[in-house]
Amino acid sequence: LIVSLIGCKDTEIKEIRAALIQLANSRPIVEITNEKFTWSVSQRAFVYPYIQLKEAAFSSSKGAIFINIENKFFKKFQARNVFGVIKAKKETDKTIIISAHYDHLGRMGRNTYFPGANDNASGNGMLLSLAEKLLLNPLKKYNVIFIAFAAEEAGLIGSEFMVENPILPLKDVRFLLNLDIMGSGEEGITVVNSTLFDKEYQLLCKLNNRKIALK
């Protein structure tokens, strides 16, 4: 089955692609697109190949192609979240979490490599630097938990596991700062639920405008 997504809206592309993924269990799929190609890992393997082609690389003339795909699916792959805790100077249950995922894409095929410097050695480097500073000077009223999450690239598995199996009551978590792709933050930080927590959002904006540099 050959499907062109050229000219489709973003919402349409998501719906069509979701349907094509389901169809890939019963037949081979070729998707024609002009979107930027990306690489990711999956929690399952398709029964048939799902191939994405650039419009310029596709010929509408009749013909056949032959491909040889080598893949290996690990049904039981173990990965672990890594935790560190710096207690507040005063006894408290209030906690701030600083997190970063430590897995990365690795490589695509035999020739394309993703060393992972930006995604996400940069986040882990920042996490360790913050831990080093806070270890010497802990916060007065907040515990700080540092979490290096596993299996983010496969669908946020490590962070989801932590939420479903928390090491502390989630009501005690006052704030979470996730460090990811720190080398290319030209557009700033992504703030989730900023409209629900306007006070905290405005505080972040105030701190950002001060342009405090780590020393």
Describe the residue ranges of each PLM region.
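Extracellular/luminal Protease-associated
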Residues: L1-Y50
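Structural recognition of the beta-strand scaffold that forms the well-ordered cores
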Residues: I2-S4, P28-E31, F83, T95-S99, ...
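Second-shell loop/turn segments in exported
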Residues: V3-T11, E15, E70-K72, R110-N120, ...
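Solvent-exposed loop/turn segments at secondary-structure junctions
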Residues: C8-D10, E35-T38, K90-E91, Y102-G106, ...
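Short alpha-helical segments and helix-capping/turn motifs at coil-helix boundaries
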Residues: D10-Q22, N68-I69, R80-G84, E160-V163
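Soluble metallo-hydrolase cores and metallopeptidase-like ectodomains found primarily
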Residues: T33-G116, S129-K141, E164
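Alpha-helical transmembrane segments that form the membrane-embedded catalytic/substrate-binding core
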Residues: N120-L127
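Metal-dependent peptidase/peptidase-like ectodomains
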Residues: L139, F149-K215
